[in-house]
A protein has these predicted regions:
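Short, flexible, surface-exposed loop segments at domain boundaries
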Residues: 317-358, 368-448, 452, 456-494
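Conserved alpha/beta-hydrolase "acid-adjacent" motif
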Residues: 242-251
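Short substrate-entry loop that stabilizes the transition state in hydrolases
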Residues: 50-56, 62-104, 144, 156-157, ...
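Mobile cap/lid helix-loop segments that gate and shape the active-site cleft of serine hydrolases
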Residues: 19-26, 150, 185-225, 231
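N-terminal cap/lid segment of alpha/beta-hydrolase-fold proteins
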Residues: 18-54
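Primarily recognizes the serine-hydrolase "nucleophile elbow" in alpha/beta-hydrolase
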Residues: 118-190
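Catalytic nucleophile-loop/oxyanion-hole region of alpha/beta-hydrolase
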Residues: 71-80, 92-131, 280-288
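Short beta-strand/loop motif that positions the catalytic acidic residue
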Residues: 229, 235-237, 241
Length: 494
């Protein structure tokens, strides 16, 4: 049945449309883009097999996290970037200054987003970017900043003066995923997502209490920065969202309509907060979120009509059906350089930029073929990022576990997010320990493994010509799986 479906999609594309290329995903990580001395970085996602003369629209991806947390390489941001690259976009996923201990970072966080747009335009030639076709997208706090980036022009007086002073910061299409559009009216919700009239949240990032400086709060709200010349806006919001009330999208749409600004809104029944373009299990959300975002960008950044947008998406579906192992858009599993020498006990030498670098993969690594090695290991205390479900009590059923090589992780189970999660070996098997609210609350979640349990390991660093993905195929005391090595193209320069 699957083969017939793939054949049908391919025939339709051949008979009625153009030959739409579906691109390999390349990534260049840890790129400085702000003024000297700033630690925030960005990652570039790009079509790795593009022709030398091809040019692509760009998209700035802005992570969420309540303006106080989150990271550019979280699962949602990886999913969005990977999907867009497949469809022929160059993306940058950015870090920006975060609020700490109640201290406000407005408007520096917003200016960081503007600087990212400037960086893309300054580096347009290296990125194969069409400089006057740049969009933005973000979720939650990132949705707020994305919408503000779309509508907040020079008249706000917040254009960055360095390091790219004078470079255009405008974008041509903005996507808001469940972001706060009016900071003065961010409602608390009932358990089913129904907003509570008159009860409001008050984020600390603004830098002043609303009673002290109400104009500052209004100024930082996208809904108050609209202009008839603003670019098209797409909003997606779950009606079951208990973090950001869906009235935010509703009120923003009304304001956009009143200004005559082209916009679309999708309110999604039964969906809560923090969704990406796909379900972690690679199932589409009920409202077809992914094709809606593709269609919006294809129309406004590529100039396609609705028929061509559908052909483009159908081509992606056909490609994914024919390449099921290459549709895991939740972690890119990146390593750096070429595997050069096996030192034993999981230690390998890789070559990068003419230098030899030693890395630790696992104690059981052997070359399986030119592009594959096998690996087995799960270490107690390893930083993890998991996807699955939690029951009413304490158990977690995992479909996927990402093993990270950084000092932080993020565990997302349905609509629940935990920071700083680690694997723990207990008498009853593996568990995940999570820390919430600093050190105030620790929880140990026993793991149950679904029939489709997979583990991915991600090594962080600049990508040159090696993409690494580890897929665990069984759990028997210790993990056993395979590490896939795929050649990628280098994006030279910063």
């Amino acid at each position: 049945m699957l083969k017939k479906y793939v054949l049908l999609l391919c025939l339709c594309a051949a008979l009625f449309g153009k030959d739409w290329p579906i691109y390999k995903i390349g990534i260049h990580e840890n790129v400085p883009y702000l003024e000297k001395g700033r630690n925030e970085l960005l990652d570039v996602y790009y079509p790795a097999d593009a022709k030398p003369d091809e040019k692509f629209p760009g998209v700035v991806i802005i992570h969420g996290g309540g303006w106080t947390g989150g990271q550019r390489d979280a699962a949602r941001e990886i999913n969005i970037a990977s999907n867009l690259v497949r469809m022929g976009y160059v993306c940058v996923s950015i870090d920006y200054v975060l609020s700490q201990k109640g201290k406000g970072t407005w408007p520096r966080n917003f200016q960081d987003c503007k600087t990212a747009v400037q960086w893309m335009r300054v580096n347009a030639e290296k990125l194969h970017l069409i400089p006057d076709k740049i969009g933005c997208i973000g979720g939650s706090a990132g949705g707020h900043l994305s919408a503000l980036l779309a509508v907040g022009g020079k008249d706000m007086g917040l254009e960055p003066t360095s390091p790219y002073g004078g470079v255009d910061t405008s974008i041509q299409a903005g996507v808001n995923l469940y972001g706060i559009m009016d900071l003065t009216k961010w409602h608390y919700m009932e358990k089913d997502g129904t907003p509570i009239e008159g009860k409001f949240r008050r984020p600390a990032f603004v830098g002043a209490k609303i009673e002290e400086d109400p104009e500052r709060w209004k100024f930082a709200s996208p809904i108050n920065q609209l202009d008839k010349n603003d670019p098209p806006i797409l909003q997606l919001h779950g009606l079951a969202d208990t973090t950001v009330d869906w009235w935010q999208a509703r009120d923003m749409k009304k304001a956009l309509d009143e200004k005559g600004i082209e916009n679309e809104m999708m309110l999604i029944p039964g969906i809560g907060h923090t969704f990406a373009l796909q379900h972690p299990g690679n199932k589409n959300y009920p409202a077809e979120i992914r094709p809606a975002v593709f269609r919006f960008y294809d129309r406004h950044l590529k100039g396609l009509d609705d028929a061509a947008c559908k052909e483009h998406y159908d081509a992606l579906l056909a490609w994914e059906a024919a390449h099921p192992d290459d549709t895991l858009y939740w972690t890119l599993n990146i390593n750096s350089g070429k595997l050069a020498k096996n030192l034993g006990k999981g230690r390998w030498i890789i070559e990068r930029d003419g230098k030899e670098i030693e890395i630790q993969l696992s104690e059981k690594v052997s070359v399986k073929s030119e592009k594959e090695v096998t690996v087995a290991d799960m270490a107690d205390g390893q930083i993890v990022n998991g996807y699955g479900k939690r029951n009413e009590e304490t158990d977690v059923t995992l479909d996927k576990l990402v093993i990270l090589d950084k000092s932080y992780g993020r565990m997302a189970l349905g609509n629940i997010s935990f920071l700083n999660s680690t694997l723990k070996k207990t008498e009853n098997g593996w568990s995940v320990e999570t820390i919430r609210n600093g050190q105030q609350q620790k929880m140990l979640w026993p793991l149950k493994l679904s029939e489709k349990f997979k583990v991915f390991r991600r090594q962080f660093g600049t990508v040159d010509d090696l993409q690494v993905g580890m897929r665990i195929v069984q759990m028997n005391g210790k993990a056993a799986g395979e590490l896939r090595l795929v050649n990628t193209v280098v994006l030279q320069g910063k």
